[in-house]
């Protein structure tokens, strides 16, 4: 009989999603691990924030709201950030749905990832002890004619101001400090992020 260990290692190396098998009186039912955790109202946002990941997160938030509008949803974040527009789609949906959306950073929440981490329900924003959080201003990469660059520059300045005001709202910091602190990449430990108001708790163990 072949050893199971090499097969498990091969599955991990290929990036395959583990399958969970549950047995009940009705027989066996298999789920991929993320679908099983979705039943526990846990949503993952891992990797770059883009239109695809935003669509997946938004769809799961809306589905869980339809399942039970009064039970909290947990959003687990490990993301270097990405598209502002995609991130704002997630942000607006988090504020739109009726259940509180709790956020938890595992690994890294940077840029839009940090913004979404801070946007969780007040008192329900967490980070694991060795997680890192990074805030900065929106990045621009304008190209084209001078008039096009001017239009894009105005849009970036608008987004910067809008994000600063929202981050000030969620952290309790004043907008001027947010503007200063996001002028360059600003990395924080979990404890620093808590002191800044980006999260409420550093979690070493599940409550």
Swiss-Prot record:
It catalyses: Hydrolysis of proteins to small peptides in the presence of ATP and magnesium. alpha-casein is the usual test substrate. In the absence of ATP, only oligopeptides shorter than five residues are hydrolyzed (such as succinyl-Leu-Tyr-|-NHMec, and Leu-Tyr-Leu-|-Tyr-Trp, in which cleavage of the -Tyr-|-Leu- and -Tyr-|-Trp bonds also occurs). Keywords: Cytoplasm, Hydrolase, Protease, Serine protease. InterPro entries: ClpP (IPR001907), ClpP/crotonase-like_dom_sf (IPR029045), ClpP/TepA (IPR023562), ClpP_His_AS (IPR033135), ClpP_Ser_AS (IPR018215). Its EC number is 3.4.21.92. GO terms for biological process: protein quality control for misfolded or incompletely synthesized proteins. Belongs to the peptidase S14 family. This is ATP-dependent Clp protease proteolytic subunit. It comes from Burkholderia thailandensis (strain ATCC 700388 / DSM 13276 / CCUG 48851 / CIP 106301 / E264).
């Amino acid at each position: 009989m072949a050893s199971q260990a090499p097969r498990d290692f091969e599955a991990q190396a290929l990036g395959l999603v583990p399958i969970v098998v549950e047995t009940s009186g009705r027989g066996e039912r298999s789920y991929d691990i993320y679908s099983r955790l979705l039943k526990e109202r846990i949503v993952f946002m891992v990797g770059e924030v883009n239109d695809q990941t935003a669509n997946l997160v938004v769809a799961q938030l809306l589905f869980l709201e339809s399942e039970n509008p009064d039970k909290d949803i947990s959003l687990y974040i490990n993301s270097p950030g990405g598209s502002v527009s995609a991130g704002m789609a997630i942000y607006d949906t988090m504020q739109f749905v009726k259940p509180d959306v709790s956020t938890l950073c595992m690994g890294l929440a940077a840029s839009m990832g940090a913004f979404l981490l801070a946007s969780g329900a007040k008192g329900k924003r967490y980070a694991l002890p060795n997680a890192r959080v990074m805030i900065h201003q929106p990045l621009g990469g304008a190209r084209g004619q001078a008039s096009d660059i001017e239009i894009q520059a105005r849009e970036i300045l608008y987004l910067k101001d809008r994000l600063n005001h929202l981050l000030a709202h969620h952290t309790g910091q004043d907008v001027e400090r947010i503007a200063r602190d996001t002028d360059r990449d600003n990395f924080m430990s979990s404890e620093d992020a808590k002191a800044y108001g980006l999260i409420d708790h550093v979690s070493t163990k599940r409550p």
